[in-house]
Amino acid sequence: MEKLRSGFISIIGRPNVGKSTLMNQLIGKKVAIMSDKPQTTRNRIVGVLNAPKGQAIFLDTPGIHKPKHKLGEIMVTTARKTLGEVDLILYVVDASEEPGGGEQFISQMLKDIKTPVFLVVNKMDTVSREEGLKKISQYSQMVAWQELIPVSAKEKTNLDRLKDLIFAKLPEGPLYYPAGSFTDQPERQLMAEMIREKVLHATREEIPHSVAVIIEHLQETPKGGMVVHATIFTERDSQKGILIGKGGSLLKEVGQKARQEIEALLGTSIYLELWVKVKKDWRQRPDVLRSFGFDEKME
């Protein structure tokens, strides 16, 4: 009988290359929020793939970029810390983009890491075959890789092949998480991220990056439902007004869409109560970052 294989895989790449979409598709569950805004992922998120061959534990890390504020520094530190602690690195690049300074920076960083690297060329569905082959050639010369896999996370193209290669590389060993687990994130964090995702989709410019969501209180109802009290923090009064919208229209839209996903997560009906508050320049304030769950010492 074939022995089980289990291990940890870090998914890295510059912002907006599709890392969260890739992880969600690989495990078949939505554990990381998705947006076309760069730097959507802020913490290291764990997603667990359970398969007959064993268990693959994915760490979806923040996109590696040049930080512009204290939160950005924490995000990049979080991404870099995982690289020497895992069994495998999936370095995700975007087939629709030319390699640039971000890829050069990451490739240089990987030279000092002994962990095996799979180069995953994502978004192959967005380019022609000729252009895709050109990008594969360009990216393949930038980093020492053990496997090179062109995929489309959005269309689920070549993901089964990627899974097979991942399990072939993982060490033999027992399951790290109970069978059936798909993430280590608490429900409160999942709910907060679902709300933040809807804010990202509904806003533009600086507002998406200026928002933090905290679940303040959960209360069960006599009929078995749940009341969820959440606060959306932003940095300026002008942003607060935009987030609320005319007559509360934008906040209502965010709440309606987030409620549907939270109900699917909890398996029960919920009443979602959203508040918007200003916490001036919170991304630059270590005390506020710690209270929001961001910390340089985060694993």
Curated annotation (Swiss-Prot):
Residues 203-280 form the KH type-2 domain. CDD domains: Era (cd04163), KH-II_Era (cd22534). GO terms for biological process: ribosomal small subunit assembly. It comes from the Bacteria. It is found in: Cytoplasm; Cell membrane. Residues 60-63 are annotated as: G3. GO terms for cellular component: cytosol; plasma membrane. Residues 151-153 are annotated as: G5. It is a peripheral membrane protein. Keywords: Cell membrane, Cytoplasm, GTP-binding, Membrane, Nucleotide-binding, Ribosome biogenesis, RNA-binding, rRNA-binding. Residues 5-172 form the Era-type G domain. Residues 122-125 are annotated as: G4. Gene3D superfamilies: 3.30.300.20, P-loop containing nucleotide triphosphate hydrolases. GTP binds at residues 13-20, 60-64, 122-125. Pfam families: KH_2 (PF07650), MMR_HSR1 (PF01926). GO terms for molecular function: GTP binding; GTPase activity; ribosomal small subunit binding; small ribosomal subunit rRNA binding. Residues 39-43 are annotated as: G2. Residues 13-20 are annotated as: G1. An essential GTPase that binds both GDP and GTP, with rapid nucleotide exchange. Plays a role in 16S rRNA processing and 30S ribosomal subunit biogenesis and possibly also in cell cycle regulation and energy metabolism. Monomer. Belongs to the TRAFAC class TrmE-Era-EngA-EngB-Septin-like GTPase superfamily. Era GTPase family. This is GTPase Era.
